[in-house]
């Protein structure tokens, strides 16, 4: 089988495509060399020499690309070229707009200032097209055989055109500036040869990636024209949805200033676009249908975008993976949203279902994959790529993952802002990055010198200390009543910086504190977070001991504790009572208090025991209740 495949392979055609790739590389390298010369503030002898050498390769590549393209000159070629150039300008600018969501000075209509008109590659592309047309005319005029002059075995196809058109995105001024900055850093460090090798390899990889994307898009156009569902159509739609939802996700957490000199950290946008594309494409491959999957993704992406925006505005925190447990409390969730918004979403959902049903049997009807083997291979490939993005985060040490990995190493390692919380990380590193850390990061970092012996030694130390303290202690906590009253709205304004009050607003509480044992509790947020305060109160385990990727201790930490020890262990089950004026299922409370042996848990809903004679203050249950 392998031998037959080897013999049937058109190696001549493959060699021609490799030659096309080489021509594309020299074309791109010349564009990079020009950017290096124009942008560097260092002595330019090295860069000038590089520019002169690359110019020779550029001229050869112009001739070579024209020669190959002459076999495919047609009206369709000019239309495809125009479509790719215009589409790339729009996509590139859309990405730029997304990357400046945190820049309140960015004006999307200042097209010239924002370098929307990126025509760097256009003159060269026009030269290639004109030369290719002239070559075709001359070949026809002189009746020259098509396989003469080195084109023997060459079979021009869509990928050939895609390889040539890949020089358009490679010439993007923003991409060239990014590459040249990395190149200049290595050159200044005296590693010019290493820099040359790395940048050359990067250009080749980028050419192949861009050529593949263009090939898929051009194939999708062909299949759309023939009303044929295909993997290319699904992949193109996935990329389009990723570009749209990348914007809407980030819009929900946008700010108005730079952080560490960035409005969005390098790699954040690309990471999120790739992540969304992979998820969407996997959905298409699994369902093997176009329209139902498309509308499902549209609805899901819209809901995530809206909820993310609402949660950020209400709680200063983005939508997190752990928030999806609230799906079991849809009634409570919808109570936070205006009825008009819910009605609009329901109507939109109904319209989507009707349209999907109508289109399903008429436009792009049928399966995306007819072959189960190809479909399974696609699923496997997508899973492998997805895992390659997730696995490195699972093996991080001291907040750092393996260096040298494309996109994710720089995104995770270069700027450590985990301590700034979920909102800041989502704003500058993307919502997808925050979600990735949530599903991959360990709940607690392993401390230095951690071992069973070390823990036993610490336990022995404090056991002895407890015995010494309890020698003269007359009272036993088990014989006393302990009440924790946690109020989200209670705090002392005297402790808030830059705030002055005309008189003491908590005189009674301060008087009680002065006459008994008293202290302060650390709150990790301004209002809210009561469930986390409950966990810390019961277990004496502070929130800051856990990973920065942890959001809700009851949902993420408690279920993984083999034997959670709490202060409630000093009391019999019948004397353990909890009250919370909301749903018992919120933040996993019902399960937690059940596992801790509480005999009663009073809640507004979801529990056996409920509050009576409820009085509200505004929308919330009063203290009197």
Label the predicted regions.
Residues 467-473, 487, 492-625:
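Solvent-exposed soluble domains appended to multi-pass membrane proteins
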Residues 478-481, 533:
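Envelope-exposed proteins and targeting segments
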Residues 1-322:
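Extended, compositionally biased non-globular segments that define protein topology
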Residues 113-124, 189-207, 233, 327-332, ...:
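Ligand-binding pockets and gating/stacking loops
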Residues 145-147, 152-154, 322-324, 336, ...:
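Surface-exposed loop/turn and secondary-structure junction residues enriched for glycine/proline
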Residues 84-91, 130, 160-161, 297-301, ...:
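N-terminal secretory/membrane-targeting segments
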Residues 483-485:
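Beta1/beta-strand and adjacent pyrophosphate-binding region of the FAD-binding site
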